[in-house]
């Protein structure tokens, strides 16, 4: 019996890519393979060969706040060996690597930090971008719509009354969201950033955020059930139908003419009309005589019309043919 079992074990078909794979006793389930290990000074023994720098402009209204906060910014970046320069004349912020910089990715985080500060994100929130696992995304919404009134209306729809819609999105996506001018600054995990970008762009394309909020709430409840981890959630998610609202009909309906590749004929000029009628060939005296005759005819017609109106006053009114009833 044991020989049969051993023969069946040896005859098990193994995929080509797993043929030479061996068991790894050190690889246990409690190890998180996606965890980002912190980068310390011991990991980088030598300084960088080249200096890297990034610069960004900021609006005039941010100048006062940045001047107050800049000492805190320099202190935060000194921990990573990065210098920063605030140019108030040019209106720009610059970050540079130094010989003390040990983390090569920290310069990219510093670049994101000055971008967020320029987009009105407060410093205590913006400095969190220097942490591992925190990313940012600046979504441009100004070039999606042409009509300014419609843009303001849809941007307000994203914020909601007293910022309730924005707060709900922050709780569901676990991201920090700030709507400022024609951009939306988002901070959080990569999964949350992807969801927020989709919601913001859909809102600008006239899809209300409440539909996405309902969907995210259902997904959060489904994630708690381990039995549904490997199943499709489409049957649980709501399917919203698009409604084509009847538009108001225009007051004047213009008739579309048939398309012709040839341009319309040129209308006849005054000279052409005179040649056709033969008036062009008349003498000056004859032309004046003709005009006088036409004028006299017009005067006669007007005189007749006025006489008719005067005679209306002398016409007696029609008496009623009904006889009065006797008492």
Swiss-Prot record:
Gene3D superfamilies: K Homology domain, type 1. CDD domains: KH-I_KRR1_rpt1 (cd22393), KH-I_KRR1_rpt2 (cd22394). Residues 247-274, 286-327 are annotated as: Disordered. The keyword Nucleus applies. Keywords: Nucleus, Ribonucleoprotein, Ribosome biogenesis, RNA-binding, rRNA processing. It is found in: Nucleus, Nucleolus. GO terms for molecular function: RNA binding. InterPro entries: KH_dom_type_1_sf, KRR1-like_KH1, KRR1-like_KH1_euk, KRR1-like_KH2, KRR1-like_KH2_euk, rRNA_assembly_KRR1. Residues 294-312 have a biased composition (Basic and acidic residues). GO terms for biological process: rRNA processing. Residues 135-205 form the KH domain. Transmembrane segments: none annotated. Pfam families: KH_KRR1_1st, KH_KRR1_2nd. Its main location: nucleus. GO terms for cellular component: nucleolus; nucleus; small-subunit processome. Belongs to the KRR1 family. PANTHER family: HIV-1 REV BINDING PROTEIN 2, 3, KRR1 SMALL SUBUNIT PROCESSOME COMPONENT HOMOLOG. Required for 40S ribosome biogenesis. Involved in nucleolar processing of pre-18S ribosomal RNA and ribosome assembly. Component of the ribosomal small subunit (SSU) processome. This is KRR1 small subunit processome component homolog. It comes from Schizosaccharomyces pombe (strain 972 / ATCC 24843) (Fission yeast).
């Amino acid at each position: 019996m044991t020989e049969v079992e051993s023969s069946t074990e040896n005859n098990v078909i193994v995929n080509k890519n797993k043929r030479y794979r061996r068991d790894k006793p050190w690889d246990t389930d409690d190890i998180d393979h996606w965890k980002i290990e912190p980068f310390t000074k011991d990991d980088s023994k030598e300084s960088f060969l080249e200096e890297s720098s990034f610069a960004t402009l900021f609006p005039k209204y941010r100048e006062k706040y940045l001047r107050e906060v800049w000492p805190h910014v320099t202190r935060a970046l000194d921990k990573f060996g990065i210098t920063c320069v605030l140019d108030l004349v040019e209106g720009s912020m610059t970050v540079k690597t130094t010989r003390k910089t040990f983390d090569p990715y920290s310069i990219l985080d510093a670049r994101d930090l000055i971008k967020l500060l320029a987009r009105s994100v407060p410093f205590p929130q913006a400095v969190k971008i220097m942490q591992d696992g925190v990313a940012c995304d600046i979504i441009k919404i100004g070039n999606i719509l042409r009509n300014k009134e419609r843009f303001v209306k849809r941007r307000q729809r994203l914020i909601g009354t007293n910022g309730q819609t924005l707060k709900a999105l922050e709780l569901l996506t676990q991201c920090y969201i700030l709507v400022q001018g024609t951009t939306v600054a988002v901070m959080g995990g990569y999964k949350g950033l992807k969801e927020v970008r989709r919601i913001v762009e859909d809102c600008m394309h006239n899809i209300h955020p409440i539909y996405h909020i309902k969907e995210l709430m259902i997904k959060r409840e489904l994630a708690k059930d381990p039995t549904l981890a490997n199943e499709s959630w489409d049957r649980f998610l709501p399917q919203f139908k698009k409604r084509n609202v009847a538009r108001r009909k225009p007051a004047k309906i213009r008739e579309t003419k048939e398309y012709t590749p040839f341009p319309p004929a040129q209308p006849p000029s005054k000279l052409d009309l005179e040649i056709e009628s033969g008036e062009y060939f008349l003498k000056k005296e004859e032309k004046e005589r003709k005009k006088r005759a036409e004028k006299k005819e017009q005067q006669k017609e007007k005189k007749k019309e006025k006489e008719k109106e005067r005679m209306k006053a002398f016409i007696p009114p029609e008496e009623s043919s009904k006889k009065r009833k006797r008492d």
